[in-house]
Amino acid sequence: DGDGAVVVMLPRKAEGVVLEAMEVTTYEPQYRLTLSNVRVGAENILARGEQAQQLLASVAEHTMAALCTHQLGASDKAMRMTASYTAERQQFGVPIATFQAVGHRAANCFIDVECLRLNCYQAISRLDDGVDASVEVAIAKVWAGDVGHRVSYAAQHLHGGTGIDRDYPLWRYCTWLRHNEMMLGSSARNLAALGSKIAAGEAFCA
């Protein structure tokens, strides 16, 4: 009707609404939604035009922030599993955690996770205060992608062959970390968006 964006809520079993099961990286239940000649009544319309655009932007921002916190939890767990494993796994009669190279890589994971934690808290606190958090959420997503990538690789490296064994749960966290890294835009994409905001004087400008 020329109103631009429209946000609607449809019954799952409405005529023309088709959900197809998808096989995704995380093995979680996800579906592809197809709408075919669906009739939308006035009672199903939640927002139109500018209000719809604002609602969609808010949902996208909150979803990205939630994804970042999920990435934080998965990164933290993978790091702690690695710390526990290297403290128990012995080589040359001592735990491999006592080797300097192992300790340094694990320490880098800890630093990464804490940096991601702080960025997540900053983004979420601004969302909770109801102020513009677009820059902070984008920064958190950059950290979420990069940290998840580095922690996943380090965890697999320090676990050796054990890390890819399906009987050991680390692989589950690594699939989450990879999935979250690419979901809703890679680090490169979000960095480019931040760069555009800076160039336009919309970010980090007094």
Regions found by a protein language model. Give the residues of each.
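FAD-binding core of flavoproteins
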Residues: 1-80, 201-206
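Alpha-helical interface subdomain recognition
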Residues: 58-206
